[in-house]
Structure formats: C-alpha cells, structure tokens
C-alpha cells in the first residue's frame, strides 16, 4: 500500500507529528495544552512557530514566511533516529550468502576479446543473505519462497526482502519487484493488504488470496528504504536517490544466486510514493550496460510523480469533478483555486533549483492549501467514497498485518533480525519532507525509460491523494517524442469476464509510444485491495506485453 499524508497542517506536524505521507489518516483532535516544563528547545521549534500561523491565513502571510524562512531552513537539523534493536544471525543460519566482492572480481571476454567485468556496478560492499522459507511453517503460499537481507557493509544498511515464486510457471513466468511508498512504508503491507499470496484476518489468521499477482509472476517484496518494516540501519535516509544503488545491488546478487530468473522478463511495480522511487531505480538499472537484470517495464499505481501537473487536480477531485460527489463545499473549493497559483509558482521554483530551500516550502504550502481542506473532513484520503475508519491509516486490516508479523514464530521463520515490525516509519517520512524530496521532478526520468521500455501508469478512480485526474494529466503533459500521439489517443474500455461469467467494463485505457494510462473504476488508492480480480486482469495483460511497443 502505501503512502501516507500524516500531519498536513504544518504547525503541529513539523514539531510533533508525522509529516506527509501519501497515505494518512485525518489528524486527531489536539488535547488541551498543559503547562510545559522548561526544557531545551526542540530543533524544529522555530520552524513550527513560524508555520503555526499558516493554519488559517496561509496565503495572507506567506510573504512574511518567505522573508524569514531562509535562516530557518538553513538551521534545520532532522531529528536523530535511534537505530532499531537487532540481533545479527550467524552465517550458519542462512541457506546462501552471495558476496558482492566475489562477483565484482569476475571478468569475462567479449566476442572481440575485450576483457570487462561480468556485471557493472560497485558491489564489493554488498552481501546478500538468503534463507529458504518452509511454506508449511507460515501457510502463506505453497510455492518456493526465500527471505533475507541485502547488507551494505560499508554503510551499515540491511534491506529485508521476501520472494515468492509464481504459482503458474516459475521457470517461464516474469519476475516482479514490488515497492510500497510512504515514504517510509513497508512493502509487506502491500503484500498482505493488496496483491500478495494471502491476507491477514481480524483474528490474525492467514487467508489465501486467489487473485494474488504471483498467480502468473514471481514477486520480490522489498522493505526500503532502510529502517522500514524489517529493514534496519544506523544511518538515516532522506531522499529517493539513495536507495537506487542498493536495489541494483540486491537484484544483481539475487539473480547471480538464481540465474534461472535472470533470463526471464523483469518488471518493477509499486504505488504512491513509488512514483518517485521507480523512475530513479529503473534509470539506475538501465545505466549499467553489463547487467544480469532483464528489465522490461515499469508499473506505477496511484503515484506521485509530477507534482506541478498533479496538484492542480486536487480541487477538482475533492469538488465533484472526478466522477464522484463533492466532498468539500463551494467556498472551500474557491479557496483552493485561489491558493493554486502561489502553489504552482513554488513548485516551479523547486523544479528549477531542486534544493531543500525551494522544495520544502512548496511541500508545506501546497499540502496545507490543497490537501489540508480534505484532510480536515474526516473522509478517507485514499477513497472519496468512505470515511476514515479507526486510527492511523484508515484501514483496520493494517493493524492485523502488524500483529501477525510481530509474532515471534513468524519472525524466526523469516530470519528477521530486528525486534519488531511497524508498517510505516514516520521518522523517515519526516526526513524525506525536510530534505525537500516530496516535490522534486522525478517525472523527468520517464522519457529516458520510455525510449527503452513500456511504462504503465494506473490509478483507482476513487483515490483522492494520488488521484486519477492528476495521473492522467501528467502523462498527457509529459514531454517525450511520442507526446502528441499519446495525448491525442482516446480512452478505450478495459473489459474482463467477471466471477459470474459476465463481460464487465472495469476501466479505461489509453496507450501510445510506450506510455499507457489506465483508470480503474470503483477502486481507491490501493487498487488491488478494492478490485482484486480486475487488478490481476490488467496486471497479467500488461506483463504479457499487450500494450508493449519497444
């Protein structure tokens, strides 16, 4: 799943609460203030005090804020995140260990006799630890499974992954990497909540998922960046780019240990803030000429990729122009329209400079002005049709997943080295925000990818936070050689035979010049959760190359 938007009203968010995610519940009512003891000033207190005034008069006072913000931002020091407690398992506990140094030392001759390294990249600092998971221990699926850690020994980073073979034809079916967003949310929530082999029930039992995406593909679920889910590190992570080299190393070492998968088609898929991650990761892979990763396409669901083009569509989606009744009243909608020009000017400054100084203010102002009004209603930001349920992320099922994964026998079966699991790490979310990553223009990498592979952007049409209007708009605005033909292409029906044997229209699609956009009807932010059969239908069609042009 994954994305959150915690704490969009800046005053309280920066100082004490989770900042923005692309997935987040409405803020809890603030308790009555109590007398505070004299303590050392919080490093964010000055920033909080300045931005507190934005709550009701963001537009009127922003010029004053901008007069003061340079010194404030320059003095920001993100909070020190205490490292997770962990117990490193001995090497004897692992089925395989792949040493990056051994792979980096391998040289081969090409047809002309030129000697070069077998695979590109700096790999010596990495090891991949692999454990064969006994399917009968957990009952998640009866297919072959592996779990383990990618270790960056130089930087003390340890990324957890869990691999499931295809239920159909593991020797011939494609392989997929799945990433959730946040930033800071575990991909195991996507696995159990959306598209993995099983879900977790209210009584913390495993329930088989007949619509799992591993029905016709093998899948790696990866907890990244570090300190997300079962991953851990003593080092903080604060931007999208940092993880790309780690993921390249993980895939390279994994396919070295399991060469049978390396020749099969490989795809990267994810949702929400993975709209930032995936263009960077895919570009990193494709920049390595000698690689054992057969990357064929990328898939981004309800993603945040081009804020400048996507943010103008928050008001239409909240105000009844996205195919569902309005959530906000007309006065609030007009106030969002008035705030938009300033928001776009600030995002443009972020795009022009790509610095914390320009990108952080854009995140704060735009999220308060264009997302904050919706957040205050109590409506589910991931599904405009329903109210937010329970605490945290609006879906009680996520608590079931956390309870299941924190059971000692589960952690032991997987070789987990940390002492607990949490679905989303708000410290990471805050760090990404404070370093300006939220508003950066990662869509600029997509044309490079389109020249080499198909790209799918899909969106459940009931989502607010990364809505279909914005995702359709940015694909149509994207500057690449196929822009005109793609933008002019009509939307066509997506159909399937449903479980009752009836031919059903479940969405719309447009595709040209390697770029495809899908609108999935009756689905929210987590499309496979709301429409499991339809999601498996379009995923299988995509993986089979139905819209490929390269």
From Swiss-Prot:
Enzyme class: hydrolase
Residue ranges the record assigns to the propeptide: 19-131
E.C. code: 3.4.16.5
Locations listed in the record: Vacuole
Pfam families: Peptidase_S10 (PF00450)
Function: Vacuolar carboxypeptidase involved in degradation of small peptides. Digests preferentially peptides containing an aliphatic or hydrophobic residue in P1' position, as well as methionine, leucine or phenylalanine in P1 position of ester substrate.
Protein name: Carboxypeptidase Y homolog A
Organism: Paracoccidioides lutzii (strain ATCC MYA-826 / Pb01)
